[in-house]
């Protein structure tokens, strides 16, 4: 069952696509303490709102 609501968390692959980087590079970022990634079982997910804040912090802009 799919919801029309925006997902709160996305896969590392989806994050890579949004950031315009390779999947292996996204997994490297996911291992960093300052990157908004977390684990659910064996899956690594990225907090969508946290990702936007992280990008803003990296570019020196406020969200």
Regions found by a protein language model. Name each.
Residues 51-63:
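A short, Lys/Arg-enriched interface patch at domain edges and termini
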Residues 31-32, 56:
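Residue-level detection of the helix-turn-helix DNA-binding "recognition helix"
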Residues 38-44:
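Short Lys/Arg-enriched helix C-cap and helix-to-coil transition segments
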Residues 1-29:
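Polyanion-binding surface elements
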Residues 22-23, 42, 57:
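A detector of low-complexity, intrinsically disordered, Ser/Thr/Gly/Pro/Ala-rich segments
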């Amino acid at each position: 069952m799919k919801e029309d609501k925006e997902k709160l968390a996305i896969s590392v692959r989806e994050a890579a696509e949004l950031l315009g980087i390779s999947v292996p590079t996204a997994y490297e970022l996911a291992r960093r303490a300052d990157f908004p990634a977390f684990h659910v079982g064996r899956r690594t997910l990225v907090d969508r709102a946290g990702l936007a804040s992280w990008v803003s912090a990296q570019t020196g802009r406020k969200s």
